[in-house]
Amino acid sequence: MTVVDIKIGNKYRIGRKIGSGSFGQIYLGLNTVNGEQVAVKLEPLKARHHQLEYEFRVYNILKGNIGIPTIRWFGVTNSYNAMVMDLLGPSLEDLFCYCGRKFTLKTVLLLADQLISRIEYVHSKSFLHRDIKPDNFLMKKHSNVVTMIDFGLAKKYRDFKTHVHIPYRDNKNLTGTARYASINTHIGIEQSRRDDLESLGYVLLYFCRGSLPWQGLQADTKEQKYQRIRDTKIGTPLEVLCKGLPEEFITYMCYTRQLSFTEKPNYAYLRKLFRDLLIRKGYQYDYVFDWMILKYQKRAAAAAAASATAPPQVTSPMVSQTQPVNPITPNYSSIPLPAERNPKTPQSFSTNIVQCASPSPLPLSFRSPVPNKDYEYIPSSLQPQYSAQLRRVLDEEPAP
């Protein structure tokens, strides 16, 4: 029996492979009862290390947050452990490539705000992610919400009840992705909250720069390659790494690198660092990312090309032939949502890499630095005073 012949939980049919996680393969799935598309992660029972059940348990602990996918089903079917979850949109790595392997500063700042919040939430549940990279952040379909995935390498760093931190250890093997690993991870120190945030710093710099200095290094063995990456990472001054970027990026990297092993990061401070930069640069917190603009421009160009090649229309002699044509003025805050697909017609997960690219017409919530206060995002066209509201939020001090 092949994978595509397997029926999961008596109602999910498996389609083609759409990706891989730290452990297991991911397939497109279809709910045969209501036609809803899902993602199915499979792990062979004969695998040397069984991690999928562990990942399922982590998801169960993290469930309920806006940036965590919902698990629909978990169990054993045929010769596989199987986990059925939300089908999400493209990853930030996919969108980065779609945008020519570089994001504008505005997009990086908008992403940073959500990514810091996702990491903070996972840490608040006593877990480290330990594999922070663009591939593990996906956009929700038809939404502007960044979702965090792949908790196969996640680790509990403190006791759930007492919050006693795990002890400091060294001589640890590198866990995660070497390109974004913290310096302490490279030198074998047990990971803690600071390492997730340092890894995020490298992700943000990757988005701004287009690449990192230690990419593409060659070596005979994996260990030698990791050593070259480590040496380059340690030997690259932050002034060089952040050259041409606002000083906030150096501040962020210095802060995360100077945290002690058990120290709780000030997530609100880091968010405010980038939010203040967003305001100082005059950007709107409007959830309009680079891929939305690029998608709009491509659609406008295609429409203009189609119009130019269309046969001329016969017009009435009473109508002036010299009437001016209004130019296309992009209104990125009102890009229409993609047409709803027929849920009974399975389509490729990557049929349109920017299915999530249109800003939602519905209000979106974002977490303020003030505990127990949620503020709704309203598109700038509906609430011009939003920037003033954001400033008011940032002026409030977080509770101790």
UniProtKB/Swiss-Prot annotation:
GO function terms (MF aspect): ATP binding; protein serine kinase activity; protein serine/threonine kinase activity; protein tyrosine kinase activity
GO cellular component term, pick one: cytoplasm
Keyword Kinase: yes
Lineage summary: Eukaryota, Fungi, Dikarya, Ascomycota, Taphrinomycotina
Protein name: Casein kinase I homolog hhp2
Function of the molecule: Involved in DNA repair. May regulate the activity of protein(s) involved in double strand break repair caused by gamma rays.
Domain (Protein kinase): residue spans on this chain: 12-278
Listed EC numbers: 2.7.11.1
Record: residues binding ATP: I18, G19, S20, G21, S22, F23, G24, Q25, I26, K41
Active site as annotated: D131 (proton acceptor)
Localization, UniProt: Nucleus
Keyword Repeat: no
Chain spans, region Disordered: 330-352
Predominant localisation class: nucleus
UniProt xrefs under InterPro entries: CK1_Ser-Thr_kinase, Kinase-like_dom_sf, Prot_kinase_dom, Protein_kinase_ATP_BS, Ser/Thr_kinase_AS
Family statement: Belongs to the protein kinase superfamily. CK1 Ser/Thr protein kinase family. Casein kinase I subfamily.
Record organism: Schizosaccharomyces pombe (strain 972 / ATCC 24843)
Enzyme superclass (EC): transferase
Secretion signal, residue range per the UniProt entry: none
One GO term of the biological process aspect: positive regulation of double-strand break repair
Keyword terms of this UniProt record: ATP-binding, DNA damage, DNA repair, Kinase, Nucleotide-binding, Nucleus, Serine/threonine-protein kinase, Transferase
The organism's place on the tree of life at top rank: Eukaryota
Reactions accelerated catalytically: L-seryl-[protein] + ATP = O-phospho-L-seryl-[protein] + ADP + H(+); L-threonyl-[protein] + ATP = O-phospho-L-threonyl-[protein] + ADP + H(+)
SUPFAM superfamilies: Protein kinase-like (PK-like)
UniProt cross-references to PANTHER family, sorted A to Z: CASEIN KINASE-RELATED (PTHR11909)
